[in-house]
């Protein structure tokens, strides 16, 4: 059992109890043999884990009147890596205890997670340049890239690296599943002080770095049931529902409408209609015409 899963179990258990004594925590720990192996949890171990949890997740576990509690629960309510890790490892714990029904639990593979992700994360930690051969799907031409790794992002079941390419003198995104001959160099770099990964992608859709596309407020209408889907799983972090009618909703997003954005809306078929701005609406109409021409009889 990895230490991270033990940390996740500790966080989830304390969160569910709000406040819990060491004795209660130890009993629950020993009872969950898939995590503990049947061993109890002592104070010294818990305090060591508490320090590791604070450093790794930014979650502060405090003790008052012999009761342990999470002092900054707001961290758990925020989106981002901490919440993603908690959800992921909580799911793994549940699946590990469900081997009897493993044939009835279906998942989607993320093949790129097996390709260089650990190496890239280590390079991120050490601010070291990485080098790899990259082959785009578009042209199939392999290129050697030397990159300052800025961040990684998971999108549509693929991991991507955002970094500054030394050869092309600019920020680029790279799909891990298109990399070969990967290596970490000894050369170090300094991450720009003003770089914020979340802020950088806040006006982008997906993994695009097309800063030449103007950032706009796009208004679109979604019909039932897709309005419900979009309400449950927003298209973008800026999404707002500005109107709710009988069988439809009107949403707004603030982003750079790139190909990935249009592609995502097109995937909803006739259940989504762009209302404004006119330029974005026209671009969508042109795409629909091009799609229609593929099905016209010669």
Q: What positions do the PLM features span?
A:
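A structural signal for short hydrophobic beta-strand segments in well-ordered beta-sheet cores
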Residues: 61, 152, 182, 241-242
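A residue-level signal for conserved active-site and pocket-lining positions in enzyme catalytic cores
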Residues: 10, 46, 127, 220, ...
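Bulky hydrophobic/aromatic content
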Residues: 8, 22, 57-58, 62-136
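Short, basic/aromatic recognition patches that contact phosphate-bearing ligands
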Residues: 1-82, 290-298
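General beta-strand recognition
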Residues: 69, 131, 160-162, 250, ...
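Core beta-strand-centered patch of the WYL/Sm-like small regulatory domain
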Residues: 104-219
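Polybasic (Lys/Arg-rich)
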Residues: 202-298
